[in-house]
Amino acid sequence: MNPTVAAASVIAAALAVGLAAIGPGVGQGTASGEAVSGIARQPEAEGRIRGTLLLSLAFMESLTIYGLVIALVLLFANPFA
């Protein structure tokens, strides 16, 4: 394998994981903070808020997992080799 392609694949994998984690990380922090705030204002709605929060956190986390899958493909099943 060309060393330039190998180095570019490693850098691209690092960027894929890093950039894929920034957005969902900020979103999860914001969503969790707002959920805690909502539960503090309306304790009787805790069940609905928590259910919605967990579902939305799962969707946000899937974006990070997609970035990880792309990084693993670039590292181990390199399509550019």
Swiss-Prot record:
Q: Name one GO cellular component term.
A: proton-transporting ATP synthase complex
- Listed name of the protein: ATP synthase subunit c
Keyword set, alphabetical order: ATP synthesis, CF(0), Hydrogen ion transport, Ion transport, Lipid-binding, Membrane, Thylakoid, Transmembrane, Transmembrane helix, Transport
* Compartmental location: Cellular thylakoid membrane
Task: Site (Reversibly protonated during proton transport): give the residues.
Answer: E61
Record function comment? F(1)F(0) ATP synthase produces ATP from ADP in the presence of a proton or sodium gradient. F-type ATPases consist of two structural domains, F(1) containing the extramembraneous catalytic core and F(0) containing the membrane proton channel, linked together by a central stalk and a peripheral stalk. During catalysis, ATP synthesis in the catalytic domain of F(1) is coupled via a rotary mechanism of the central stalk subunits to proton translocation. Key component of the F(0) channel; it plays a direct role in translocation across the membrane. A homomeric c-ring of between 10-14 subunits forms the central stalk rotor element with the F(1) delta and epsilon subunits.
Cross-referenced HAMAP family, in alphabetical order?
ATP_synth_c_bact
Q: What membrane topology is annotated for this entry?
A: Multi-pass membrane protein
One GO molecular-function entry: lipid binding
Q: From which source organism is this entry? A: Microcystis aeruginosa (strain NIES-843 / IAM M-2473)
Keyword Repeat in annotation = no
Q: Which InterPro entries match?
A: ATP_synth_csu_bac/chlpt, ATP_synth_F0_csu, ATP_synth_F0_csu_DDCD_BS, ATP_synth_F0_csu_sf, ATPase_proteolipid_c-like_dom, F/V-ATP_Csub_sf
Work out whether the entry's keyword set contains Thylakoid: yes
Supply the source organism's classification: Bacteria, Bacillati, Cyanobacteriota, Cyanophyceae, Oscillatoriophycideae
| Main localization (coarse) | membrane
The record's Pfam families line, in alphabetical order, gives: ATP-synt_C
The entry sums up its family as follows:
Belongs to the ATPase C chain family.
- How does this protein assemble? F-type ATPases have 2 components, F(1) - the catalytic core - and F(0) - the membrane proton channel. F(1) has five subunits: alpha(3), beta(3), gamma(1), delta(1), epsilon(1). F(0) has four main subunits: a(1), b(1), b'(1) and c(10-14). The alpha and beta chains form an alternating ring which encloses part of the gamma chain. F(1) is attached to F(0) by a central stalk formed by the gamma and epsilon chains, while a peripheral stalk is formed by the delta, b and b' chains.
Transmembrane stretches, start-end = 5-25, 57-77
Signal peptide residues on this chain, from the entry's feature table: none
